[in-house]
Amino acid sequence: MARVAGVDIPRDKRVVISLTYVFGIGKSTAAKILETAGVDENTRVRDLTEEELGRIREAVEGYQVEGDLRREVSLNIKRLIEIGSYRGIRHRRGLPVRGQNSKNNARTRKGPKRTVANKKK
């Protein structure tokens, strides 16, 4: 397996798809990277030469990926929580942050249902 940005990318897939295994690189970014490196998108990773892999690695270094990106995202969330913004409060409470209705659904963010005991009549 070839390593790019500390991640083993699959050898059997096309390069443009394999690059998306790196956190922070989607399909469009992968296409831009390959264009910069001068590598055809349809080439399989196993068919790449060491020189082409080197050019791809250099192009990826220009982007913030993997650990650095994860760290930045977590620091951004911590900052929102510390300043007490609405988004920070939603993060702290584990509720949807982007304005979704949470009266009935939002189970992905809220977790499994917690039943509340009925008071006697």
UniProtKB/Swiss-Prot annotation:
Segments of this protein annotated with the region Disordered: 92-121
Classification via Pfam families: Ribosomal_S13 (PF00416)
- The entry's protein name is Small ribosomal subunit protein uS13
Keyword Transmembrane recorded: no
User: What GO annotations for molecular function exist for this entry?
Assistant: rRNA binding; structural constituent of ribosome; tRNA binding
- Sections of the chain in a coiled coil: none
CC per GO annotation = cytosol; small ribosomal subunit
What species is given as this protein's source?
Shouchella clausii (strain KSM-K16) (Alkalihalobacillus clausii)
InterPro entries the record matches: Rbsml_uS13_C, Ribosomal_uS13, Ribosomal_uS13-like_H2TH, Ribosomal_uS13_bac-type, Ribosomal_uS13_CS
User: What is said about its interaction partners and assembly?
Assistant: Part of the 30S ribosomal subunit. Forms a loose heterodimer with protein S19. Forms two bridges to the 50S subunit in the 70S ribosome.
* Compositional bias annotation for Basic residues: 106-121
The free-text function statement in the UniProt record for this protein reads: Located at the top of the head of the 30S subunit, it contacts several helices of the 16S rRNA. In the 70S ribosome it contacts the 23S rRNA (bridge B1a) and protein L5 of the 50S subunit (bridge B1b), connecting the 2 subunits; these bridges are implicated in subunit movement. Contacts the tRNAs in the A and P-sites.
Q: Which family does it belong to?
A: Belongs to the universal ribosomal protein uS13 family.
* Keyword terms: Ribonucleoprotein, Ribosomal protein, RNA-binding, rRNA-binding, tRNA-binding
- Gene Ontology BP term (one): translation
